[in-house]
């Protein structure tokens, strides 16, 4: 494990190093919540946990600066628990093993947690600082952002007092985000009665892995391969041409990550196994050809393993309906923003497919900065799975964050950034969910901007943070807090 705590600036890296030692996957936040409260008590910082599981910290103004506008610094405490297929890491018990790789910090075949651990570490650095001049400050460290923004959604109104929100969940240094996409989770489920497998049939497990995956908002416009969408094309042909039957399917594991791996168990007549192996080889070639220049094709694996024949399998009619629905379900970009053609407006990610033991569950995350188009896409997907006889539920819907290019805090941030770095910052809206939109719905008078150091491949085992960006990011935060204007 690399010693990252002495990297510059030590104020942030020291705290981030501590965070890597505390397990904090989404949905399992008891340890990090307790750690943050204990840390605040030891640092002499006022802190409490609200009913939503968020940690709120408060620091009074430096004497003489009590009349300045109040600033809320915001980041989320949870991290995406993704790992390489051969990793034995347990996200609920094991610390993250960090590695310094040139100008980057990464983990050992797991997500790093810099999304959004570096934001949390920045809040901690400000709160414990003894020499930083500032007005009234609050730190809002939210729970379960990655699985549905539940902490932000359940944030009590009236809990915060600030006038300005600095969100630290943007992943390209020099970009200042003033708008984001809304989102909605779509879950299609079906209970079915399994049927017996033909005793003369063999069984084969087919695995596709080695795809890049990635963030289903930020990287959806790159055209990366979706393991579930690739797999369904193969499965449909195996069923129609080789008399194969579906016994089970497992693809993807995170609603907001492009699935990089999928596996199915098929049963089929023994005399067709060789033809199935040939079909897998053909589809591997096809996938590599289609995604040449997008995927790292030498990492793609598509292979078969002979397995014990399961006693039960999916009924033929149910199987065909499920396969057709997965095949037809929209995945990827639906529309670019008409006013900003370089930015994705509406997209969806066919994130998770689980078909096993008489139960099917398919999970999709749709995003759009346009509320009508978000619901149009969600209803399109609902209709697709309704035709397969599935029950479809919507959850976790949140609206987008409408940009305000005349924001006072944006103007101030851009001014300080140019003073410090000699170049102009880039104002952006992003095709991803940021908690800013939800917090704004509860605190509509906040002036909001989001920024942060550069991260690459968040939500994947290749996640990494650029070391050289963290110091200028910290310098910007410090000067901003010092120069916040009076109310």
List the model feature ranges, each with a label.
Residues 158, 223-241, 268-273, 320-327, ...:
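His/Asp/Glu-rich mid-to-C-terminal helical/loop segments that flank catalytic regions of hydrolases
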Residues 23, 103-106, 146-147, 153-367:
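Midchain, well-structured core segments that form catalytic/ion-binding scaffolds
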Residues 65-147, 152-163, 189, 203, ...:
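Active-site metal-coordination/substrate-binding segment of hydrolases
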Residues 9-12, 338-341, 345-358, 421-479:
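Zn-dependent metallopeptidase/amidohydrolase metal-coordination segment
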Residues 219, 226-228, 233-249, 403-446:
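Active-site-adjacent substrate-binding region
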Residues 40-46, 237-245, 292-296, 343, ...:
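Short secondary-structure junctions
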Residues 3-103:
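Acidic/His- and Gly-rich active-site-bordering loop/insert found
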Residues 343-432:
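Substrate-recognition/cap regions that form aromatic- and gly/pro-loop-enriched pockets
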